[in-house]
Amino acid sequence: MSKYSEIAAQGLWKNNPGLVQLLGLCPLLAVTATITNALGLGVATLLVLIGSNVLVSLVRDFVPKEIRIPVFVMIIAALVTCVQLLINAYAYNLYLSLGIFLPLIVTNCVIIGRAEAFASRNSLAHSAFDGLMMGLGFTAVLVVLGASRELLGQGTLFGGADLLLGDWASVLTIHVWHVDTPFLLAMLPPGAFIGMGLLIALKNVIDSRVNAMQPKVESVSVTRARITKVN
């Protein structure tokens, strides 16, 4: 398996930031009431991940080890500020919907963790690809959780898509079934915890079945012969 294939497998499945590392749970559980919010936060995190990995990889040889963490945090904070200003300018309603969780991307352990564990020790290309794959893996978890909560809670999919894509995107809303009263358990944080637990359980079941299908390698025991010298 090539280096890029291994990075992709780690980010999307084997070491997924949300399902395996369980990082960034605060925004993951709080913002994923709809697909729109989940996708907006996921794309913002993805952009910051790629940018921080690239910049950290570029400056890794010039930053003393003693101050590397503060420097990494400053880089991440600058990128989050840029993304925040962009969303504020071009998707103001989404900016209001995400609220405090948008600037809190600075404290997301996924980003600082990849900067320290990977980007500071690998090449520019590998670091950028790692940021892309980790960001996509995190965004996928956000979107799946947001879709399930929106579907169970409101009976819709892509509700409020115009907040992210503009007024024309209001036609993207899909009404799967009619709901007179929203299912509050799915819409509130307790429902997010339950949904997250079910997603983790599903991943573990899939992994266990895949491992069970793998051919078993039988270990051959070797008995060491004792040689006694005869005079």
Curated annotation (Swiss-Prot):
Residue spans crossing the bilayer: 18-38, 39-59, 69-89, 93-113, 127-147, 157-177, 182-202
Disulfide bonds: none
Superkingdom: Bacteria
E.C. code: 7.-.-.-
Membrane topology field: Multi-pass membrane protein
Location in or out of the cell: Cell inner membrane
The UniProt record lists the keyword Transport: yes
One GO term (biological process): electron transport chain
Record HAMAP family: RsxE_RnfE (MF_00478)
General function of this protein: Part of a membrane-bound complex that couples electron transfer with translocation of ions across the membrane.
Protein name: Ion-translocating oxidoreductase complex subunit E
Taxonomy of the source species: Bacteria, Pseudomonadati, Pseudomonadota, Gammaproteobacteria, Alteromonadales
Name of the gene: rnfE
